[in-house]
Design a protein with these regions (language model features):
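Short microdomains enriched in Cys/His and/or Lys/Arg
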Residues: 251-264
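Short, Lys/Arg- and Gly-enriched loop/turn segments at beta-strand edges
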Residues: 51-61, 102-110, 250
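Local cysteine-cluster metal-coordination motifs and their immediate loop/turn environment
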Residues: 125, 203, 225-254
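FNR/FR-type flavoprotein reductase catalytic core
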Residues: 81-224
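Ferredoxin-reductase
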Residues: 2-91
Length: 264
């Protein structure tokens, strides 16, 4: 059953909004109440001003919440009109959002070492988890994938968080290993040293990571991306097909037990 929505309306002000990789931006907003309640793996649903015909909010995972500073940092890719307008919001710009949305990562209590697998703009919620694991003294290794070197984000963050091993793969070989990140991830899972796997990125990547985790009897969670209209369970536009029926990503996700997901 979905948990009751914990989302509330929050006004925010842009602190900074800058490009950190090709087509990928870091947005830092001031939203003190939100910053104190977000948990790793949750998301926010942002109203982007500038187009009266655009009625839907933009659902985005977050990277870091600083309760002391009252700020939230969100990484996003410019992929359409809404995110293009979001990228044009400068310091001092204001709007509102709904959050925190959904529920976050659920790391098993007996996990001693985790494997984190992130691809493309799926890095932020995984990096957020990495920093949380570090605070909890849980060891972790990381596999990061991107289309090319110009689109890689998060490597320094994973290293700073204390990752044991960091493997980078790019489709074109312009940075790290050439190929798909699922290959080294599957090999690492075969070593039998992980108690948990978390993955976010392209659907096919998460599907293959989930398959490798199942083959090695390792509990795996995935953070799924879906278009949303409301973000609090009323519209049924973000449904995920699972073995237990259709589940809304906004309420039952965005993180799911990978073994129960039918369509990633």
């Amino acid at each position: 059953m979905p948990t009751p929505s914990s989302a509330h309306m929050h006004d925010f002000e842009v602190v900074s909004n800058k490009e950190i990789a090709q087509g990928i931006f870091s947005l830092v907003i001031s939203a003190p109440k939100l910053a104190s309640t977000l948990k790793p793996g949750q998301f926010v649903n942002i109203a982007v001003p500038g187009d009266a015909s655009s009625l839907l909010r933009v659902p985005l995972s977050y990277y870091r919440a600083d309760a002391e500073a009252g700020t939230v940092e969100i990484w996003y890719a410019v992929v359409g009109d809404d995110t293009r307008r979001l990228s044009q919001m400068g310091p001092g710009s204001t709007s509102d959002l709904l959050g925190p949305g959904g529920h976050g990562w659920n790391v098993p209590a007996d996990c001693n070492r985790a494997l984190l697998v992130a691809g493309g703009i799926g890095v932020p919620p995984v990096l957020c988890l990495a920093e949380d694991l570090s605070r909890r003294c849980i060891a972790f290794d990381v596999c990061v994938g991107a289309a090319c070197g110009d689109k890689v984000v998060g490597l320094d963050g994973f290293k700073a968080a204390g990752a044991g091993e960091v493997v980078l793969c790019t489709d074109d070989g312009s940075a790290g290993q050439k190929g798909f990140v699922t290959d080294p991830a599957a090999k690492m899972l075969g070593l039998g040293k992980y108690g948990y796997v978390a993955s976010c990125g392209p659907a096919i990547m998460m599907q293959k990571v989930a398959q490798a985790a199942a083959e090695n009897d390792v509990y795996c969670e995935v953070s799924l991306e879906r278009m949303m209209s409301c973000g609090f369970g009323a519209c049924n536009t973000c449904n995920v097909e699972t073995v237990d029926g259709m589940k809304g990503a906004c309420m039952c996700g965005p993180t799911f037990d990978a073994s129960k997901v039918v369509v990633f």
